[in-house]
Amino acid sequence: MSLNVDLDVCVLERPNVCSFKKRSCSKLSCSLTKKRRSSKVMSVEIFEDEHDAEELKVVDAFRQVLILDELLPDKHDDYHMMLRFLKARKFDLEKTNQMWSDMLRWRKEFGADTVMEDFEFKEIDEVLKYYPQGHHGVDKEGRPVYIERLGQVDSTKLMQVTTMDRYVNYHVMEFERTFNVKFPACSIAAKKHIDQSTTILDVQGVGLKNFNKAARDLITRLQKVDGDNYPETLNRMFIINAGSGFRMLWNTVKSFLDPKTTAKIHVLGNKYQSKLLEIIDASELPEFLGGSCTCADNGGCMRSDKGPWNNPDIMKRVNNGDHICSKRSQADNAGENIISQGNNSAVEEAPETDQSQPSPCQNVVVAHPAWNIPEAHKFSLSKRDVYAIQEACKATNESGRSPIFTGVMAFVMGVVTMIRVTKNVPRKLTESTIYSSPVYCDENSMNKSSMHGKKMATTTISGEDFMAVMKRMAELEQKVTNLSAQPATMPPEKEEMLNAAISRADFLEQELAATKKALDDSLTRQEDLVAYVERKKKKKKLVRFQINAYLTNFCFGV
């Protein structure tokens, strides 16, 4: 999909909206010039949050599209959230707009805005027993660290203590808690905007039993939730305790993933401690991962939920909105903003800028340089609808839009599982490269010269090869399911056959003993006969000697 967008179409289809916006703009301008600043305006501690000027322009243009389509609720009017969605669709406005619309629809249908108040996950202790996972501390850059011990996952018992729907609800609830509490707390502690996490996956002991059909169905659902509604939130991932076979499989799996994604994933063996300590302080790393933390007073590291969000002072500042940050472009890194706290949107005084930079007083739409928009197609909006590059970002408790567990991780583990159970993958399948992550567009290369100055091309895989792999995996999975479904006790008919075989063996053993006894008796009798024959021979020799002696005496008259 080309990055070119004809913004004039939106204006032609919505003349009433545009005129309404212009009237609102005039009224708002008058009110702002006549009224004094609200007494609620106060200076807060500013956190530097520099961004590329081109990204600010693209986000602003996307914001205008959302406003025209009436798809920008106040709580989602957040720069970082819109930028993540744009990156997820490679800055394709049309696809990003569709993704954003689907996200709003999903949040309304799922009830994501109220899940923290409405949902209670009573079986959390049992779930963590069969699926050890959770946050523990932050890395050296202030990002929260999420840990999963996949080798200890028992998906069968997990589905016995909860249901798939309830676990998905719990998953979304943890997302919302992270966005509303954890990332704002990390931002205050690090004095910069935090909206990504560091993930550690311990795969020691991972086998087929950890990824049966129930586990894969759960991963698929979580992947869809993450990829569609919480994109671009993984900073880095460490897969530790990976054996030689796992690393070999990873080299194959990498060909299925976007290089941008694989650059975030580090597969390590059992000597991972030094690498983790480069990223995470020992005091923030659990002892079983090479750190010094035990969390003995909180039931262990996997149950402690350690992090700055447990600090009362930081949470007080989060509740007061102190995690609001200033947004400055790299082109203009000067000027200090005043943040207005109140029910209405923030009223700010933008610093004086060069005429080449967009200003909120100039009713122009900031367009990406790659867009070929004729001059006649440009239109004006109210200054409330324009993001000035120097304008401070509005961050509330809902502004930390980043998940605990991204769709990238779910996809990687799903592909690893597929490769583990399918030994005979076609050769050309392993040699191909495909962008399989749900947060990217199609396989056509897209021009991002204004953003990165590079082009990335992809190669597709044939549907026949993919279906062959999936069919093979389904067959093997069915065999494993059938074997797992067999009872632990022996069926009655087989038990009878076994008892008959044992009885027959006992009978044969008795016959063998009798035969052995008969052989022993025969051997004894044979020995007796041999002794009797020897005695007869000796007696015969004696008689013959006596006869010879008698005849000799008789003949010679002795």
Curated annotation (Swiss-Prot):
Stretches assigned to the CRAL-TRIO domain: 123-297
Topology of this chain in the membrane: Peripheral membrane protein
Organism: Arabidopsis thaliana
Protein name: Phosphatidylinositol/phosphatidylcholine transfer protein SFH10
Pfam families cross-referenced by the UniProt entry: CRAL_TRIO, CRAL_TRIO_N
Job description of the protein: Required for transport of secretory proteins from the Golgi complex. Catalyzes the transfer of phosphatidylinositol and phosphatidylcholine between membranes in vitro.
One CC-aspect GO term: plasma membrane
An example Gene Ontology biological process: protein transport
Location in the cell: Golgi apparatus membrane; Cell membrane
CDD domains: SEC14
Keywords, ordered alphabetically: Cell membrane, Coiled coil, Golgi apparatus, Membrane, Protein transport, Transport
